[in-house]
């Protein structure tokens, strides 16, 4: 609803993107500082996508090695709520892009990794594909 209220006041969604990005930066910096080697993808995999998030998002690690960390989310509580709110597919795709600013920021904290968002549940797919690849 925050985006809806902002639109009523003549604001675009930039404020939300920036705020969520900053939140992701904070998380990324904390992860970075907790790691012995922030260029080590295996160590990164022990920090990203762990804890209670694995259950909430029904996360499945589909690939994890020195070169990549690929995680599929099989559930998104945001999309579930947006559906209840009656959001159309275009709105959900935009809201998802905004919400993913946090993960983008986490990825950009690590110079050695490239973050990619693949398919998303908000786009109508059955998974959200979170991908981190080691830069060559």
List the model feature ranges, each with a label.
Residues 1-97, 113-136:
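N-terminal accessory segment detector
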Residues 94-107:
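A conserved amphipathic terminal alpha-helix motif
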């Amino acid at each position: 609803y925050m985006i809806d209220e902002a639109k009523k006041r003549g604001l675009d969604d930039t404020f939300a993107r920036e705020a969520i990005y900053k939140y992701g930066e904070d998380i990324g910096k904390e992860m970075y500082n907790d790691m012995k080697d922030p260029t080590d993808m295996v160590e990164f995999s022990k920090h990203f996508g762990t804890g209670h998030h694995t259950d909430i998002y029904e996360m499945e690690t589909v690939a994890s090695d020195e070169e990549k960390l690929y995680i599929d989310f099989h559930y998104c509580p945001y999309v579930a709520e947006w559906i209840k709110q009656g959001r159309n597919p275009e709105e959900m795709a935009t809201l998802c892009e905004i919400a993913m600013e946090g993960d983008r920021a986490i990825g950009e904290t690590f110079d050695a990794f490239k973050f990619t968002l693949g398919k998303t549940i908000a786009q109508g797919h059955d998974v959200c594909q979170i991908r981190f690849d080691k830069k060559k």
